């Protein structure tokens, strides 16, 4: 589709230390290569503290079977990277954000990325999804067929829920 994800930031608050596109290549039944948008990984300092960002724009729900498999694989790749970061340093600050092209209650999102709707349920490597509480029939990030959908989401690692630094999730 030739559409990439990006990160817009203010230099006075955020300093990029490293970044890399994470490219996934898929093969169909005829062994033809197929691509999705890259995941953008960025490590940087946000007001002096190291954060890890994964910016996504996942495949749409059109061509459900094909794209669902791609989405599941993307979730697995991100989850592995998150697990690696947290295994190396359990207090890493990690945010996964972007257009998930699905709701916060999607089972693949919950299972593959190990997300939780409540802060108190994040006790280890789980990710907190505050968007679950925001989704309703009266609001969202887009309207499809006259119905609100909440596809744009942010997921946070446990360290954002603790009061041990300058950066924390505040409701």
Question: For the regions a protein language model found, what residue spans apply to each?
Answer:
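Structured beta-strand-rich core segments of catalytic domains in phosphoester-bond hydrolases
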Residues: 1-50
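Soluble non-cytosolic domains of exported or imported proteins
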Residues: 34, 65-73, 145-146
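Active-site His/acidic residue clusters
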Residues: 49-68
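Loop/turn elements at helix/coil->beta-strand transitions in domains of secreted/extracellular proteins
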Residues: 49-51, 90-93
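Active-site metal-binding loops of divalent metal-dependent hydrolases
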Residues: 58, 99-100
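A long, amphipathic alpha-helix that forms part
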Residues: 68-90
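Metal-dependent phosphoester-hydrolase catalytic domains
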Residues: 86-92, 102-171
């Amino acid at each position: 589709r030739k559409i990439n994800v990006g990160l817009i930031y203010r230099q006075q608050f955020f300093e990029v230390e490293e970044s890399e596109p994470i490219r996934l290549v898929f093969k169909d039944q005829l062994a033809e290569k197929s691509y999705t948008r890259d995941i953008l990984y960025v490590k940087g300092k946000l007001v002096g503290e190291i954060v890890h960002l994964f910016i996504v724009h996942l495949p749409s729900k059109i061509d459900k079977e094909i794209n669902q498999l791609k989405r599941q694989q993307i979730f697995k790749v991100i989850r592995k990277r998150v697990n690696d970061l947290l295994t190396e340093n359990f207090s890493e600050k990690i945010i996964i954000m972007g257009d998930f092209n699905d709701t916060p209650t999607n089972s693949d999102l919950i299972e593959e990325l190990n997300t939780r709707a409540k802060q108190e349920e994040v006790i280890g490597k789980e990710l907190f999804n505050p968007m679950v509480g925001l989704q309703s029939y009266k609001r969202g990030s887009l309207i499809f067929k006259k119905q609100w959908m909440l596809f744009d989401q942010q997921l946070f690692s446990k360290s954002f829920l603790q009061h041990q630094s300058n950066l924390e999730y505040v409701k």
